[in-house]
């Protein structure tokens, strides 16, 4: 299914606090060592902890890795157990993140869903979804065209910006990403 998502730049960078990551280039304009980000999150409602999560991104001169995990905790586990892990790995070429692999496992109650995607040059080479997505007349079938020039959901959340000191510059926010998550293909457009 193809669909679109439009965010303002301010909303996109608000997502940075929840997992979207902006990484800066070196002053020379080339790919300089990027560094590592580790973030831990607690989800609360009226002071009651309902969940927790972690997000780790490690970006170097020529490769990157991102891992996220989360789970329900405390009172929320009484009503529904849930946990998940996602990971993406890829290459950095000419200041562009090129995903190579993506995996995701999400368990809610007794149901587990797994997604595995292998990519090369922005094209999906292989993917597997367990359990398979049931056919539906309301769902647009995935074609080969939907699997070209795409990012996985995690790699799409990484934004490379120039090291000019202004992460919220309008040009940094004008981005478009075609995303394939194993079940559907959708667009994410960021605007200032």
PLM features per residue range, with description:
Residues 2, 74, 152-153:
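Poly-acidic low-complexity segments
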Residues 25-114:
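N-terminal cleavable signal peptides for secretion/export
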Residues 1-16:
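Bacterial N-terminal signal peptides that target proteins for export
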Residues 108, 112-192:
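Solvent-exposed helix/loop surface patches that form functional interfaces
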Residues 14-28:
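Hydrophobic h-region of N-terminal signal peptides that target proteins for export
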């Amino acid at each position: 299914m193809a669909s679109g998502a439009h965010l303002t730049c301010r909303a996109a960078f608000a997502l940075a606090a929840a997992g979207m990551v902006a990484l800066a280039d070196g002053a020379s304009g080339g790919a300089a060592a990027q560094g590592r980000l580790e973030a831990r999150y607690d989800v609360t409602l009226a002071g009651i902890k309902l969940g927790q999560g972690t997000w780790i991104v490690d970006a170097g001169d020529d490769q990157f890795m991102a891992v996220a995990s989360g789970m329900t905790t405390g009172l929320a586990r009484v009503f529904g157990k849930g946990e998940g892990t996602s990971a993406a790995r890829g290459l950095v070429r000419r200041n562009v993140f090129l995903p190579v692999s993506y995996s995701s496992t999400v368990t809610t109650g007794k149901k587990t869903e797994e997604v595995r995607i292998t990519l090369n040059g922005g094209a999906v080479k292989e993917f597997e979804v367990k359990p398979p997505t049931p056919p539906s007349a309301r769902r647009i079938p995935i074609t080969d065209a939907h699997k070209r020039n795409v990012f996985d959901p995690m790699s799409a959340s990484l934004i490379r910006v120039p090291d000019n000191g202004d992460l919220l510059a309008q040009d940094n926010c004008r981005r478009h990403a075609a995303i394939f998550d194993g079940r559907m293909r959708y667009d994410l457009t960021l605007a200032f």
